[in-house]
C-alpha cells in the first residue's frame, strides 16, 4: 500500500503495468544484490553455492514472493510483456549473476569446465526441487530453515558431483 493518491502514483508511472513492473523490479533487486555479495565473498565454492542456494530458496518460497509470482503469472495472459519483463529482471538476472560466478570458478579450476549458463540453470533447478511447485500450488507451507538447509545441501552435493573437480 502506498500512502498517496492514484494521481500522485500516475505522475511517476504512465500505467498500472509500469507501476506493477516497478514493484516487481524492487523485489528482484534485493535478491540480486544479496547474490552478488555472496558470489564476491571469496569463499570456498561449496560454501558460496550453499549460501546462494539458501538465499534463493528462502526468497522464492516465501509467502510474499509466492503470492507475487501467482499475480505475475495471472497477468501474463493479459499482458505477456509483463511476464517477459519479470523473467528478465528476476530469474534471468539471477542466472546471469550465478553464471558469472560459476564461469570464474571454472576458470580458477575450482569447477570442471562447462557451459556456465547451463550450469547456473541446473543449480537453480536443483535448488527448486519440488518445493517451488508445491508452494505455488499451496500444497506446502513456507519451509522451515532446516528444510531449506537440507534441500540446498542436496542440491550442492548433486551439482558438485557433476561440476566439482
Please report, for each region that a protein language model flagged, where it lies by residue:
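Short amphipathic alpha-helical segment with a characteristic S/N-K-E followed by hydrophobic residues
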Residues: 15-20, 30, 82, 86
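Residue-level signature of the cytosolic catalytic core of signaling kinases
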Residues: 41-45, 61, 112, 144, ...
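C-terminal peripheral helix-coil segments that are non-catalytic and often amphipathic
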Residues: 51, 55, 96, 100-108, ...
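Amphipathic alpha-helical packing segments from all-alpha helical-bundle domains
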Residues: 47, 59-62, 66-67, 71, ...
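Helix-turn-helix
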Residues: 1-18, 22
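Amphipathic alpha-helical linker/stalk segments
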Residues: 23-52, 98, 104
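Helical hydrophobic small-molecule/effector-binding pocket
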Residues: 25, 46-78, 124-132, 161, ...
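Membrane-interface starts of transmembrane alpha-helices
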Residues: 112, 116-120
Amino acid at each position: 500500500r502506498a500512502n498517496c493518491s492514484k494521481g500522485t502514483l500516475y505522475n511517476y508511472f504512465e500505467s498500472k503495468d509500469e507501476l506493477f513492473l516497478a514493484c516487481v523490479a524492487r523485489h528482484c533487486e534485493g535478491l540480486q544484490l544479496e547474490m552478488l555479495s555472496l558470489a564476491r565473498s571469496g569463499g570456498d565454492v561449496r560454501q558460496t553455492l550453499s549460501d546462494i542456494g539458501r538465499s534463493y530458496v528462502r526468497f522464492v518460497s516465501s509467502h510474499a514472493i509466492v503470492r507475487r509470482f501467482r499475480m505475475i503469472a495471472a497477468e501474463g495472459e493479459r499482458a505477456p510483456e509483463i511476464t517477459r519483463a519479470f523473467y528478465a529482471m528476476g530469474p534471468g538476472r539471477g542466472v546471469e549473476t550465478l553464471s558469472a560466478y560459476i564461469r570464474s570458478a571454472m576458470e580458477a579450476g575450482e569447477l570442471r569446465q562447462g557451459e556456465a549458463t547451463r550450469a547456473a540453470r541446473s543449480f537453480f533447478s536443483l535448488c527448486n526441487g519440488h518445493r517451488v511447485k508445491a508452494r505455488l500450488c499451496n500444497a506446502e507451507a513456507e519451509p522451515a530453515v532446516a528444510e531449506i538447509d537440507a534441500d540446498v545441501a542436496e542440491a550442492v552435493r548433486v551439482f558438485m558431483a557433476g561440476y566439482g573437480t
